[in-house]
């Protein structure tokens, strides 16, 4: 016998976390939402509605797919005796067209997530284990690019080599005023399954940013993820070099472990190091957390982080959050 939830899914064609295809159309809707309760060191408790994100997929032709992600960021902040939406911003995260030539060759044009490492490509709150994000996954480079990309899987290379090659000449589609976007950029990311449980990747990017024109930066990164039986270990390391010299260079990395505790409860631990340009020494961040993953679409996270040599005001303290994938 079907449960009420299963029956509803059968009636509407919708299942939580899988998106909803509009009947009699080629349009699919999805998205996610995330909210957090934070107690950052030295500040009062804060309740934030962090993200309300809408995904739209449209496939008018067999080979052509259009995709957009629009996100309402920080739509509501509640503190002691104060409620505000002053920080609300409607961001265009992604807007692109994909043309599928074959498994080995596809083309993308528009605004997309910069293919550096793994975290940036799967950063949606319901898909990651922690509320906070490692600094190396967003500080050294713009997380979005507007331009063109060729990507695919080369099945002739061992178990299959995934690749992305991209370029940007700036002119960001709806640039986020909080970010220093690309002026010019090109780069690549390669990912390879060494075995069934281990994926490794390398990244390279050469770029110039809008607010720092004339300064060329080279970013080199490696990433790896091992997962088996509910356990997971992941890491990313990155080095950014600058034409302005060592004082403008950045480097860092993290290693994160996840272990099942029984049922739907998981323990999470992470160590990260990050040295921002001009900052000496780098910051060391330790994190411990507990997650309750109800299913693939709904997760409750709790974590506490502590920093050493925190001269860049990296966030540390307690965070509790809930995230749902539609």
Which sequence ranges carry the predicted segments?
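Cleavable N-terminal export/targeting peptides
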Residues: 1-13
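Residues that define the transmembrane beta-barrel architecture of outer-membrane proteins
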Residues: 45-50, 88-93, 142-146, 182-186, ...
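C-terminal hydrophobic structural anchor segments
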Residues: 258-301, 308
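Outer membrane beta-barrel
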Residues: 16-29, 35-170, 191-196, 261, ...
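Membrane-embedded beta-strands of outer-membrane beta-barrel proteins
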Residues: 52-54, 95-97, 148-150, 188, ...
